[in-house]
Amino acid sequence: MRRPFKAAAPTKDGPRSNRDIRVPRVQLIDAEGQNRGDVSINDALLLAEEAGLDLVEISPNAVPPVVKILDLGKLKYANQKKAAEARKNQKVIEIKEIKMRPNIDSHDYETKMKAVRRFFEEGDKVKLTLRFRGREMAHMELGMQLLNKVREEVATIAKVEAEPKLEGRQMMMVLAPR
């Protein structure tokens, strides 16, 4: 036996409104914000129609559900504006990478540290990568000393998020701003 295809009901975004509200009685708040009390859904729909506005479900889980007479278009627009504002104010934290060698010169080190501090001021995380070449692999302690020196210098403005670890010929440490 073949079963007929039953498509899922289309889901609407936002609160239920007007005829979508399927309860016999509701708690009504009119357009002026006055609580009209417990009324039938038909009376509430008539009042909304007379006002030229929509009946919108504000609190569906209350008993009876709370509905308000307002302009649904304005409500959706305000919600979109609020969401856009929240997205605009969101800061994406990036991970900036600083590459060094274990036998870095003092001036080069200072230049790299200036960049590290600038990244922390911008609110970004910093991944310090030490690359070992050739026989430098025999002197891992120099790399650890360098990473510890960096850690001490930025201790007031940053915290260690990932302890120094060795991966192949590289030693890495991740720092995050405080």
Curated annotation (Swiss-Prot):
Gene Ontology annotations for the cellular component aspect, listed alphabetically: cytosol; membrane
GO MF assignments: ribosome binding; translation initiation factor activity
An example Gene Ontology biological process: ribosome disassembly
UniProt KW keywords: Cytoplasm, Initiation factor, Protein biosynthesis
Region annotated Disordered, chain positions: 1-20
Keyword Cytoplasm set for record: yes
Pfam families: IF3_C, IF3_N
Subcellular location: Cytoplasm
Keyword Protein biosynthesis carried by entry: yes
InterPro entries, alphabetized: T_IF-3_C_sf, T_IF-3_N_sf, Translation_initiation_fac_3, Translation_initiation_fac_3_C, Translation_initiation_fac_3_N
Family: Belongs to the IF-3 family.
Subunit (UniProt): Monomer.
Protein purpose: IF-3 binds to the 30S ribosomal subunit and shifts the equilibrium between 70S ribosomes and their 50S and 30S subunits in favor of the free subunits, thus enhancing the availability of 30S subunits on which protein synthesis initiation begins.
Family matches, as PANTHER family: TRANSLATION INITIATION FACTOR IF-3 (PTHR10938), TRANSLATION INITIATION FACTOR IF-3, MITOCHONDRIAL (PTHR10938:SF0)
Protein name per its UniProtKB record: Translation initiation factor IF-3
Source organism of this protein record: Mesorhizobium japonicum (strain LMG 29417 / CECT 9101 / MAFF 303099) (Mesorhizobium loti (strain MAFF 303099))
